[in-house]
């Protein structure tokens, strides 16, 4: 059937060509118009052309896939195949209609088709086909050839019926399974099962939660108050993390300090810087403890009763080295001193390491407490000074509170505090120093102190006195190394405090608190700060020139001379 | 560098996915139980905060620690055309002191999670790792024994493959072609792009779980054919 159809198709095409090609006066053989309409040859032609195009498109796609070596999208290709299939069916239908009207194309026998016509007309099968046919027939009629023909026919009919029934049941089973598995029909578009809207939304929500949790940790962060270490740590963490009892800050700190001395001490330095931001809970938990320590010991400073802050200073009458914490103290704040003494006694009772730790904590608290204590004393200063310029400098995290502290200067910045923030604030402090030195007034002493550039040498004795931990010391030295080379000796420091400001590196980091200490020292012991007053105006005018050290130099020189008494 | 895609699957279909993966990958699955601790440092000096992850494999007899840093993803027009996410990744085994070390360096705990599930490691154009896990969070710090799933009904599927800057395109195409095999059950996409669940997941899961889908294997080859044949003989 197919072969005939194709033949007919080719014959029709030939016919059409014959119709189209010779426009000459030769009588063109045309089909009867009625027949043409009936046959709808145009439609067949269109279908044939579209089929041809579809197949060629598929071939092109495959060619492209082969060339670019990409994996083909099988879904698309299968779709295209199904389209081709459909078109073929349609064409075959059409041809069937056409072939009813025409049986053979060459109507007349002439020289051209004399040889081929018999072959076309013969109905005898080709030899291979014949053999095939025979074998199939034998297979079919096996055991039935003896019977008379009608019975053979009946048997064949029953066989056909049985096969038909089997096919139908198979189809049924397939259809049922397809329904059960929601596969959709074989032909036609697949009906995908859609999710219920509400369910889809819920799933979408959950998915967003999950993805956020995995990729960015949303929803997994415990708030600070819930970050209590569970007492029963899992096996793999048991040795690694310190388990604090979390009852008292001191005991916590001490316990943790004992266990993890090196990381703790170095952590403390970093923490001091972070404390002002009230950094979140750490695994060690010290920083969680220190704010509470801050509140409990408001202006605590681990100083001795001696007003002299510097250990190695020849001008200081008292030897600071007799206590582990050479914190400095203000005479003006007796209350604070008392508190400090009390706490110092407390500290004395604790083991040494714990003292250091507590000191560190208190220092940190002090930094936070400084603002409260010193605001009252330095109102005028604050009015005079331009904080904004300070902020323009090194943007340290604690630039703002440090600004306060600089101008307040009262509460001593203990050496511990200094080195806590020293490394990160040195440059800032330096800049500030220049300006602060030019302020006047008794209250300016703190400013002056803050403004003074301090060097390593001053810090280091304090540090060595206060902190026995090795890790701190080298760190501080490194941090301040770039500073004033003149500041090799503490005594020099005191005398050169004013000068130091001018000469110090703009980029170096100076601990501001220490500077405050120095200034306070001078104020307390020497009373040499009266000379600042005349320079107050200059300082204000010079505040703009933050970076310009030279402007400050004349002032410094004057002050230096005055300071050196 | 690594190429990574993520997808989600409902917990009820996880077993079917396991069967499918077993058929495709041809390897045995490995159990997965990883405690992931994400540490962030506070930028003290104006630097950018950096993040590092410590992974503790709790499935081994001795917990083994790995430190991993995930960098930024590749950007640009080329990156948008690739269907996987290519990002820098550095990973190394470390001793158990890593946590202390990072704390000393100033890294603080940002968040932690526990992944429980299974993983397949195999080679198919690239060294691909598929992990299917439920992501659990801990209500108390470090309480891995009391972890609860973040999303009980949904598990995370992650397909990763290490890559280098020279061969990441091949690795990306290997990963994406592997992902096409999983299409009946789930869609995978770049992390951060949500996909939703696949509507054919239920049907595919049923067919995978049925006996015709291939039993767990003694011969990976035949099972692969069986499973593959059924999964998309639609």
Predicted segments with their positions:
Chain B
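Activation on folded, globular domain regions of eukaryotic proteins
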Residues: 2-7, 92, 108-110, 131, ...
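Polyanion/phosphate-binding surface patch
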Residues: 1-98, 130-141, 152-162
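Mixed-charge, glycine-accented linear interaction segment located at domain edges/termini
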Residues: 160-196
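Short, highly charged C-terminal tails/helix-capping segments
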Residues: 188-234
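Short proline/glycine- and acidic-rich turn/helix-capping motifs at secondary-structure junctions
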Residues: 35-43, 116-120, 192-202
């Amino acid at each position: 059937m197919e072969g005939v159809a194709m033949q007919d198709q080719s014959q029709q095409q030939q016919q059409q060509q014959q119709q189209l090609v010779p426009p000459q006066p030769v009588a063109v053989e045309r089909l009867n118009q009625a027949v043409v309409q009936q046959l709808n040859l145009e439609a067949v032609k269109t279908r044939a052309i579209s089929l041809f195009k579809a197949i060629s498109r598929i071939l092109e796609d495959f060619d492209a896939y082969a060339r670019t070596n990409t994996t083909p999208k099988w879904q698309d290709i299968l779709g295209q195949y199904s389209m081709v299939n459909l078109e073929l069916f349609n064409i075959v239908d059409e041809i069937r209609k056409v072939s009813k009207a025409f049986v053979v194309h060459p109507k007349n026998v002439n020289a051209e088709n004399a040889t081929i016509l018999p072959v076309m007309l013969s109905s005898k099968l080709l030899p291979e086909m014949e053999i095939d046919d025979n074998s199939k027939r034998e297979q079919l009629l096996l055991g039935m050839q003896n019977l008379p023909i009608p019975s053979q026919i009946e048997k064949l009919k029953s066989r056909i019926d049985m096969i038909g029934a089997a096919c139908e049941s198979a189809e049924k089973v397939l259809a049922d399974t397809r329904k059960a598995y929601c596969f959709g029909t074989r032909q036609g578009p697949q009906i995908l099962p859609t999710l219920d809207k509400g369910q889809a939304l819920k799933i979408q929500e959950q998915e967003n939660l999950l993805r956020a949790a995995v990729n960015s940790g949303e929803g997994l962060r415990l708030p600070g108050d819930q970050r209590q270490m569970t007492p029963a740590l899992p096996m793999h963490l048991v040795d690694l993390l310190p388990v604090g009892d979390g009852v008292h800050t001191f005991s916590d700190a001490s316990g943790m300090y004992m266990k993890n001395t090196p990381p703790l001490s170095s952590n403390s330095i970093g923490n001091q810087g972070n404390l002002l931001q009230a950094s979140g809970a750490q695994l060690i938990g010290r920083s969680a403890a220190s704010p509470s320590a801050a509140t409990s010991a408001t202006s605590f400073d681990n100083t001795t009763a001696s007003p002299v802050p510097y250990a190695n200073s020849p001008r200081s009458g008292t030897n600071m080295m007799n206590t582990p914490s050479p914190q400095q103290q203000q005479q003006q704040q007796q209350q604070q001193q008392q508190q400090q003494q009390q706490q110092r006694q407390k500290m004395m009772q604790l083991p040494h390491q714990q003292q250091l730790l507590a000191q560190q904590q208190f220092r940190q608290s002090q930094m936070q407490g400084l603002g409260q204590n010193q605001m009252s004393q330095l109102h005028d200063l604050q009015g005079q000074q331009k904080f904004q310029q300070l902020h323009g400098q090194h943007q340290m995290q604690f630039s703002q509170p440090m600004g306060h502290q600089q101008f307040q200067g009262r509460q001593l910045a203990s050496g511990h505090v200094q080195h806590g923030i020293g490394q990160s604030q040195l440059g800032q402090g330096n800049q500030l120093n220049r300006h602060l030195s030019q302020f006047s007034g008794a209250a300016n002493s703190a400013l002056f102190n803050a403004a003074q550039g301090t060097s390593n040498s001053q810090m280091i004795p304090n540090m060595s006195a206060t902190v026995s931990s090795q890790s701190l010391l080298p760190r501080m030295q490194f941090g301040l190394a770039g500073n004033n080379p003149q500041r090799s000796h503490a005594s020099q420091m005191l005398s050169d405090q004013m000068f130091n400001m001018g000469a110090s590196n703009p980029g170096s980091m100076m601990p501001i608190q220490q500077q405050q200490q120095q200034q306070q020292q001078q104020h307390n012991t020497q009373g040499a700060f009266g000379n600042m007053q005349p320079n107050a105006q200059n300082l204000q005018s010079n505040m703009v020139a933050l970076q310009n050290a030279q402007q400050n130099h004349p002032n410094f020189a004057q002050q230096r001379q005055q300071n050196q008494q | 560098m690594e190429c990574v895609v993520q997808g989600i699957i409902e917990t009820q279909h996880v077993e079917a996915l396991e069967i499918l993966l077993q058929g495709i990958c041809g390897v045995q699955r490995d159990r997965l139980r990883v405690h992931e601790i994400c540490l962030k440092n506070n930028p003290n000096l104006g630097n950018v905060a950096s993040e590092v992850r410590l992974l503790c494999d709790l499935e081994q007899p001795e917990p083994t620690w790995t430190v991993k840093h995930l960098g930024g993803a590749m950007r640009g027009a080329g990156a948008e055309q690739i269907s996987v996410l290519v990002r820098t990744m550095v990973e190394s085994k470390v001793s158990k002191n890593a946590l202390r070390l990072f704390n000393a360096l100033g890294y603080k705990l940002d968040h932690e999670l526990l992944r429980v599930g299974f993983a397949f490691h195999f080679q198919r154009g690239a060294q691909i790792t598929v992990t299917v896990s439920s992501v659990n969070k801990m209500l108390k710090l470090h309480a891995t024994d009391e972890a609860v799933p973040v999303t009980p009904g949904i598990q995370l599927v992650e397909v990763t493959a290490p890559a280098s800057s020279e061969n990441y395109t091949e690795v990306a195409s290997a990963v994406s072609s592997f992902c096409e095999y999983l299409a009946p059950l789930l869609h995978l996409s770049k992390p951060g792009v949500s996909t939703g669940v696949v509507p054919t997941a239920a049907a595919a899961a049923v067919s995978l779980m049925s006996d015709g889908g291939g039993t767990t294997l003694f011969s990976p080859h035949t099972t692969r054919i069986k499973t593959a044949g059924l999964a998309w003989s639609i």
